[in-house]
Curated annotation (Swiss-Prot):
Part of the ABC transporter complex MetNIQ involved in methionine import. Responsible for energy coupling to the transport system. It catalyses: L-methionine(out) + ATP + H2O = L-methionine(in) + ADP + phosphate + H(+); D-methionine(out) + ATP + H2O = D-methionine(in) + ADP + phosphate + H(+). GO terms for cellular component: plasma membrane. It is a peripheral membrane protein. SUPFAM superfamilies: ACT-like, P-loop containing nucleoside triphosphate hydrolases. It comes from Rhodococcus jostii (strain RHA1). The gene is metN2. The lineage of its organism: Bacteria, Bacillati, Actinomycetota, Actinomycetes, Mycobacteriales. GO terms for molecular function: ABC-type D-methionine transporter activity; ATP binding; ATP hydrolysis activity. This is Methionine import ATP-binding protein MetN 2. Gene3D superfamilies: 3.30.70.260, P-loop containing nucleotide triphosphate hydrolases (3.40.50.300).
């Protein structure tokens, strides 16, 4: 893959009186053409500023932003408009014109671009069919559900056939079921149209559902960058660990361990699970050592066709047998025994 967006030592500061706020701090980042790239961070992490730097709505204080091999940092406003014509944008609050029909909203970028009326009609019909709203062409936004409004927003963003789609908290105002519908549509946009998508979010579930790679932002800096599988399965930065813990509770917390120790009389161990770790082979042989086991906590997650997680086990049997099972587990994965 080749880059479609590059941040080269980009810093963006804002001044308020005598105070200076650093919203984006020395960011180096490459987004590859054709991928779905997630940017996640808590409120104030710099996510929205980052996306505004991509479409030139903000200029960096220092560094370069390169979009489709064009350094947009010092472009004039007129030249920036040509770059923005290849960038679509969808928003949290949809930003539809209430006085225009669904078809009118989708057609708006084409009107601005000077498309002839008949070509506009054909393109709008094509897009509404793509997003599953052909029957809503004459409806108005107030007659639509939240999910339908976002579908209109996606169709409008695709009107001029952009190479890059920026989705800024595009599912934050939706219920969980509708969120999944919209995410499926974004995957369809990426897969069938080849559009690169940058998903800005504070929800790790969104990243897990659609992204190929993810950057974790904290205080304006990229504190972790990698495939979604790597960041989920082995988060390194405190911010990454915090996000992952909100949706994956594979390892017991101290309070959970206290409860497990009081409930189960055997020895308690937590073993990491990775593809090919062969934990099952070790456990299937445990009976031969006079040891029985029970899974008392944990879970396995499949992501990008790979599995990871952890299992907390009670091992019951003679000490030498349990010791041997733990020793064998440690030859295939990381194991931590809970001390009594």
């Amino acid at each position: 893959m080749t880059p479609i967006v590059r941040f080269e030592s980009v810093t963006k500061t804002f001044s308020s009186g005598k105070k200076t706020l650093t919203a984006v701090d020395a960011v180096d980042l490459t987004i590859e053409r054709g991928e779905i790239f997630g940017v996640i961070g808590y409120s104030g992490a710099g996510k929205s500023t980052l996306v505004r730097l991509i479409n030139g709505l903000e200029r960096p204080t220092s560094g370069r932003v390169v979009v489709d091999d064009v350094d947009i940092t010092a472009l004039s406003e007129s030249k920036l408009r040509h770059v923005r014509a290849k960038i679509g944008m969808i928003f949290q609050q949809f930003n539809l014109f209430r006085s225009r029909t669904v078809a009118g909203n989708v057609a708006y970028p084409l009107v601005v671009a000077g498309w002839p009326r008949q070509k506009r009609r054909e393109r709008v019909a094509e897009l509404l069919e793509f997003v599953g709203l052909s029957d809503k062409a004459r409806a108005y936004p107030d007659q639509l559900s939240g999910g339908q409004k976002q579908r209109v927003g996606i169709a409008r963003a695709l009107a001029t056939s952009p190479d890059l789609l920026l989705a800024d908290e595009s599912t934050s105002a939706l219920d969980p079921e509708t969120t999944q519908d919209v995410l499926r549509l974004l995957r369809k946009v990426n897969r069938e149209l080849g559009v690169t998508i940058v998903v800005i979010t504070h929800e790790m579930d969104v990243v897990r559902a659609v992204a190929d790679r993810v950057a974790v932002l904290a205080e304006g800096r990229v504190v972790e960058l990698g495939t979604v599988f790597d960041v989920f399965s082995e988060p390194q930065a405190p911010a990454s660990k915090s996000f992952v813990s909100t949706i994956l509770r594979n390892r017991p917390e101290p309070a959970d361990l206290e409860r497990l120790r009081s409930r189960f009389g055997g020895r308690i161990v937590t073993a990491d699970v990775r593809d090919g770790s062969r934990i099952g082979d070790v456990l299937s042989d445990a009976g031969g050592h006079g040891v029985r086991f029970e899974i008392v906590y944990g879970g396995i997650t499949t992501l990008q066709d790979r599995s990871f997680g952890s299992l907390t086990l009670e091992l019951v049997g003679p000490d030498d047998g349990v010791d041997d099972v733990i020793r064998r587990l440690r030859t295939v994965t990381d194991v931590e025994e809970v001390q009594a």
